Each structure stands twice: as C-alpha cells, then as structure tokens.
Amino acid sequence: MVTKAFVLLAIFAEASAKSCAPNKADVILVFCYPKTIITKIPECPYGWEVHQLALGGLCYNGVHEGGYYQFVIPDLSPKNKSYCGTQSEYKPPIYHFYSHIVSNDTTVIVKNQPVNYSFSCTYHSTYLVNQAAFDQRVATVHVKNGSMGTFESQLSLNFYTNAKFSIKKEAPFVLEASEIGSDLFAGVEAKGLSIRFKVVLNSCWATPSADFMYPLQWQLINKGCPTDETVLVHENGRDHRATFQFNAFRFQNIPKLSKVWLHCETFICDSEKLSCPVTCDKRKRLLRDQTGGVLVVELSLRSRGFSSLYSFSDVLHHLIMMLGICAVL
C-alpha cells in the first residue's frame, strides 16, 4: 500500500509539472509608453509557467492576461529607472531602457530549454517644469532561446520635409495656425530584418486623445488605402519602409483640447510567403496567421497650430505607432 502511495504521488507530481502545453512561438509584445513599459509573451513559452519567469531576472511579477504572460515596468521616472533590474542609459537627448524576461527554475533538474526575451525602449527626452517627458522614437525587440536562435528588429517613426522622403525632419517642430491644411510626410521604418520583410501600413486614424480607442475618431487610412483625397499613401508593402502624407488638421468644438493623435497599425510582412504590396483598387488583403507582438510607439510633437500597433509567425511583426502633434490655437 505504501508503494502504491508513492507511485501515485510521483504520477501526480509529474502531471502537475506538465500543467501547461509548451508554446514554441517566438513572440513578444512590447508596449512602450511614456511612463510605463508593458511586455507580454505567449503563455507557457517552451513549457515555462509564469511563476518561473523573472522580469530583469529578479521579479516574479508576471500575471496571466488573455493568453499571455504580462510583465509591467510601471515607473520610468528618474528616481526609479532600475525597477526590477531595468537598465537605463542617457545620452542627451536620448533615454534607453533595457530589460529582459528569463526562465529561472530552482528545481534539481530542468527539462525545458531556457528562454530569454530581451527588449528595449528608446525615448527622445524633453523637459517641462523640471520633469522629464519622453517622446518615443524607437522600439527594439530581441528574442533568444535555446534552439531557435535569435532575432532583433528595430522600428522607428520619422517625419520628412517633402514627398521624396530623403531628408528627415527632427521632432519636435512647430507648426503655425496658418499651416492647417498643409502636407505632413511620415514613414514607418523597420531595421535589422532581411530584405524579404516589407512594412505594410494597415490603418491610420486620429483622435483628440492619446487613447487609440477613444470614441471620437477620424479615419485616414483603412486596409492600407486612403479614406479620402487628402491622404496619399506613397509606399506600402514594397520596401522596409511605408510612407504616406496627410493634410494637417484639428478637431472642432472640443474645448480645452489642443492635441490630435494619429494612430497607425503596421505589419511586417514576409514577402517570400505572402503577397505584401497593397493595391487600393482591391481592398481585400491577406492578413491571416498573425500571432503576436505589439510594439506601441508614442511620439509627441509640439506645435502652435493644430495637431495631428508586429506579430511574429515565421517572423511577422505587428506594430502600433502612435503619433501625437500638440496644438495650441
């Protein structure tokens, strides 16, 4: 009887250790907000439970969130840049924040391959009333595990002086009230990936709030195509950069608001497996098999006149870029 008890106990322990089905998708979602960084990875990566994964190798603060394990760095203020092992670097006027999520099991043996999800957020700093305000320009993700190798990609949002998109326009910049209706030129660019991957601009919409789900919205681009004649998409799905232009504007009849936020959802498409170029006379596009990582990039541009989401399935990234142009009229 005692022997049977030990056998049952061993079987129970083994079953408990395999309570989650190993997920072998190399996917990471990174939300880089001005004051907070949120990172998500698919639950049970390579068989690891959430309590076995540590943010910065120090904090076991992951929680289940809609099929993912979520880790939060809640404070990027100068007094707390090292939260849970977060590393920071300041090279004026740029702030870099680095962290990682690693597997860490204290049992006698380990049967799951180790994982290491490293990520960073890069911010362009400005100073208002002696407090640092971050305007993000770049987000970088680096994934490493025991058998699948590594990948690293860098995404950036840039403004340009004209439709040639050859000369970048450094932010922040000032626009006068008389410039409402003038053209603004923007591009979403991916770096660190091979030429087989193309940037595909899916949708862009504007809100009078930094919240991309704000109920009052003005659609600019839908399914890769302009919604009216004031928006022009130059390159979409043909290169490592998607470029477009739109007329500067502001929302009416909204008291005490001087900001308009432009939100753009962008995909990185594997051109060897999918047809990436977007043709606007054929609105139906293949956007299946998207599982994954979201990088949120928020950029605030100050002006005086008005203002203005990457999955990895066989390497398919999904990015949400948020661009805000502050306006004072």
From Swiss-Prot:
Keyword entries, A-Z: Cell membrane, Disulfide bond, Extracellular matrix, Glycoprotein, GPI-anchor, Lipoprotein, Membrane, Secreted, Signal
Membrane topology, record value: Lipid-anchor; GPI-anchor
Gene3D superfamilies cross-referenced by the UniProt entry: Zona pellucida, ZP-C domain
Keyword Isomerase on entry: no
GO molecular function: extracellular matrix structural constituent
Subunit structure: May form homomeric filament after self-association or heteromeric filament after association with alpha-tectorin. Interacts with CEACAM16.
Residues of the signal peptide: 1-17
Record: glycosylation sites: N80, N104, N116, N145
InterPro entries for this protein: ZP-C, ZP-C_dom, ZP_chr, ZP_dom, ZP_dom_CS
Lipid attachment points (GPI-anchor amidated glycine): G305
Disulfide bonds, paired cysteine numbers: C204-C264
Protein name as catalogued: Beta-tectorin
Occurrences of domain ZP (ranges): 19-283
Domain of life: Eukaryota
Role summary: One of the major non-collagenous components of the tectorial membrane. The tectorial membrane is an extracellular matrix of the inner ear that covers the neuroepithelium of the cochlea and contacts the stereocilia bundles of specialized sensory hair cells. Sound induces movement of these hair cells relative to the tectorial membrane, deflects the stereocilia and leads to fluctuations in hair-cell membrane potential, transducing sound into electrical signals.
Annotated localization: Cell membrane; Secreted, Extracellular space, Extracellular matrix
Posttranslational modification: The presence of a hydrophobic C-terminus preceded by a potential cleavage site strongly suggests that tectorins are synthesized as glycosylphosphatidylinositol-linked, membrane-bound precursors. Tectorins are targeted to the apical surface of the inner ear epithelia by the lipid and proteolytically released into the extracellular compartment.
Cleaved propeptide residues: 306-329
Free-text comment about domains: Zona pellucida domain may enable to form filaments.
Any Pfam family the entry gives: Zona_pellucida
Record-level GO cellular component terms: cell surface; extracellular matrix; extracellular region; extracellular space; plasma membrane; side of membrane
Lineage, uppermost ranks: Eukaryota, Metazoa, Chordata, Craniata, Vertebrata
